[in-house]
UniProtKB/Swiss-Prot annotation:
Gene designation: Rbl2
Spacer, as annotated region: 614-824
CDD domains the UniProt entry points to: CYCLIN_RBL2, CYCLIN_SF
Name assigned to this protein: Retinoblastoma-like protein 2
One of the record's GO cellular component terms: nucleolus
Sequence ranges of Polar residues compositional bias: 661-674, 683-692, 935-950, 958-969
Subcellular location field: Nucleus
Residue segments, region Domain B: 825-1021
Chain positions covered by the region annotation Domain A: 414-613
Amino acid sequence: MASGGNQSPPPPPAAAASSEEEEEDGDAADRAQPAGSPSHQIQQRFEELCSRLNMDEAARAEAWSSYRSMSESYTLEGNDLHWLACALYVACRKSVPTVSKGTAEGNYVSLTRILRCSEQSLIEFFNKMKKWEDMANLPPHFRERTERLERNFTVSAVIFKKYEPIFQDIFKYPQEEQPRQQRGRKQRRQPCTTSEIFHFCWVLFIYAKGNFPMISDDLVNSYHLLLCALDLVYGNALQCSNRKELVNPNFKGLSEDCHPKDSKASSDPPCVIEKLCSLHDGLVLEAKGIKEHFWKPYIRKLFEKKLLKGKEENLTGFLEPGNFGESFKAVNKAYEEYVLAAGNLDERVFLGEDAEEEVGTLSRCLSAASGTESAERTQMRDILQQHLDKSKALRVCTPLTGVRYVQENSPCVTPVSTAAHSLSRLHTMLSGLRNAPSEKLERILRSCSRDPTQAIADRLKEMYEIYSQHFQPDENFSNCAKEIANKHFRFAEMLYYKVLESVIEQEQKRLGDMDLSGVLEHDAFHRSLLACCLEVVAFSHKPPGNFPFIAEIFDVPHYHFYKVIEVFIRAEDGLCREVVKHLNQIEEQILDHLAWKTKSPLWDRIRDNENRVPTCEEVMPPQNLERTDEIYIAGSPLTPRRVGEVRADAGGLGRSITSPTTLYDRYSSPTVSTTRRRLFENDSPSEGSTSGRIPPQPLVNAVPVQNVPGETVSVTPVPGQTLVTMATATVTANNGQTVTIPVQGIANENGGITFFPVQVNVGGQAQAVAGSIQPLSAQALAGSLSSQQVTGTTLQVPGPVAIQQISPGGQQQNPGQPLTSSSIRPRKTSSLALFFRKVYYLAGVRLRDLCIKLDISDELRKKIWTCFEFSIIQCTELMMDRHLDQLLMCAIYVMAKVTKEDRSFQNIMRCYRTQPQARSQVYRSVLIKGKRRNSGSSESRSHQNSPTELNTDRASRDSSPVMRSNSTLPVPQPSSAPPTPTRLTGASSDVEEEERGDLIQFYNNIYRKQIQAFAMKYSQANAQTDTPPLSPYPFVRTGSPRRVQLSQSHPIYISPHNNEAMPSPREKIFYYFSNSPSKRLREINSMIRTGETPTKKRGILLDDGSESPAKRICPENHSALLRRLQDVANDRGSQ
């Protein structure tokens, strides 16, 4: 229920009052509220909260005004004080004037105090703050700050869970300490206790972490920083007089000479970093680097500032009775000042007695006298775990295209161990390499017609300078930040040369001795490859990486960046699971919205392709299409992916079972085709195209064929061959005379189809002109060639082509059934076609998932897909600066409406939010109007962003007058109502003259105008008339995994099993129940056992009396299975 008081629906946008009028009306309304009204009680509680926080008047007024504005437009569910705390935090982080420096960010009000006074936990605050940012439409920099704040909290929460068991491993339990006696003024300097060391070590760690902004939200480096703190404190504890009461004697890292004895300890403390790393999931090399370059210099500065007292030369003595009290107090005070100045979370809350209430997390295990957890602690531990699972800060969500193949992380795997494993795999990959080409790569580059070695080196040098300039370090630690940047780029160079060598080798295996100078001189390829390497290095050190920052600083268009992702994954075997999933996420982001930006090269490629977007059937392999008549492509089921298996090669989208695409295809321009399948009725052929209209039929590749003799050919179908029949073909000669030719076609041995003219009628006389006409291929009829020149004549196909399969019994297969030839290839392989193949595959997977959750039938799903494909092909600019999911949700809604199977936008968006890529901004911030580039496409695309006066009866019935705040949750909650977007109340922070609104506004004003006419053709009213054919749906086929090494220490691999479609034998044995004799069963058993067909004739005997090798019976020591596999291999080799 709403707790914001009696609220009336907001007025329509056109009648909205100005901000000044709203403030005046609001003030008058506040003065008119009776003392006992809910609004008055809320304001009274707000005033009390501000008084407790000593809030300044400007922040108080701004927070109250913002809260009133939100409560008028949204239903703010839950405790009103929690929403007021969000408004106060936003107001406190605004710039305020100062006496000396002009302005400063923040008013030094602690976030922790705001949450304590409003009785709100941190987890609740982050959940509500995300909704508040959406409702208020806060600028991106504020959202980034909140995300960084949440990430810092998440990192600290995870590290604190690791801190407790590590501390218990090296120090004694607090309950083992002797109870402290009451100390007088003269007895203050007593030895420190384990509990005090526990608090001191944590405060020292979080203070150091906060002063390293480049690693403060880095889980791996922050964890290593904690190990450095424990190493320092442990070494100091060994030198304390009461070290027997502090150090755990069972600690495995304690050597014999360091055991606590009565004798005086050594002056130099021991280093236990290596032992801590081996016992607690650390990386020794990384931890020692952090200790030498970050930790030690920082601790020396603390000694110089007198925050730590002791021996500065060896960083000891601060645990001595005379120094510990003052050192602890000074570090605590310095940390408090940092928290107030930076506005960050006070991470000492993890140590407090009320940690469950303040954080929503587990209590300190060191304060528990018993080893068992209470019900409250178990509940709070579960709350924290749910937040960590829901937060995407420290884990990579499996993309929807891979959730059925890869099992989620095991619950016993911690974020620290996962991050450490990713970094460890990176070090293993790069071990023994240098940031320069290997001797083998140098030879390969020199063998090119134009040696690109120097150009590659110059490009890397330029990109390093760019990377160093954009790496913005903190001024106090510029040297450390620069060293991190140098280290990351050096790792990226090593990985770049390693992957480049693998890519070139793979290309040479596919293309033979073809010169690769053209591809290796492609600047976009090299920049994309190095940017991808840098992203992998950045992600391994600090999830979730730096994308799209890396691509932007190098000016790499996203449309070019995506091309290298699959190449990178295929070329590098050592990538860990998390890195592959991260690259998959990047690829999906590019495909669903980043590549569709206004200035993307994608629009240039479409314009080069005659402003034409290829259809799904044109770019997808036929075996990956689900036919509209529900007949699936025949063939044996491919090997399913095993649970928990690393599927690096399946990380991309739309992986087909055909051979991988070459680099040349990925970076080539689209091939212009003048022939086009007219899928939609309003799709008229362009000038110069053939007049033939080819229905959606599976096609085979064209192959060169020989001329037909100059006589009339009679085609006799042969069992096992494919007969292609066509009614007529019209030939226009050079003199303009029209010739009508009946033709027939036979599938040849190479997988092509040869067409033969049967008879030519010229002026009523039959003439044989086949000698002057070459046989035609199916590719010519499909339109993949610009034109078909046939010895001075032009062939035009006025009628459809029927492809029929000739069965052994002489019966023909029904027209329209899919072919099972293993030689079927996609029609188009240009870079544009590859892009749309992945887009269609991604959209198909997401749409299928939504339809399952919305309980949509397969018939309606195919209609929705046809509508979506229509919007992509005919209304392409609908995607400009928009999101693929927006068009999918609109297509679901409009097709459900016209077919009377209504699905509300509320339910559609509710199901959408369950997908891993879902973000509330997708349906809350949709482009309505803005400066748009006209790509010169059809007239219907040029004015699609203009507002239209349409009846809103279809969508308005699904919308409620007040938006519920829970609609912004990334994951639906049981208590949340379905989302009903309305207008955004905050000031727009987008580009100037750009108007944005919610998804329903986009549907009413723009989408419906473009789609309505086409969608109505599938309505029940038009069911009796001819409706457009349904587009084939992408069929998800799982491929076999690639060769994967199980262990870096042992050469054990899992290799893929080639499970392609088995060719049907020419001789078959049929058994009919209650009809065939028993002899037929014995023949079948004999064929399976021996691998020979009983009806085969004996092979011709050779001179030595043996049979032909092809007819020889399998030896007894070989199984029939091996024989059959060998036959299959021979058949494939001959193709």
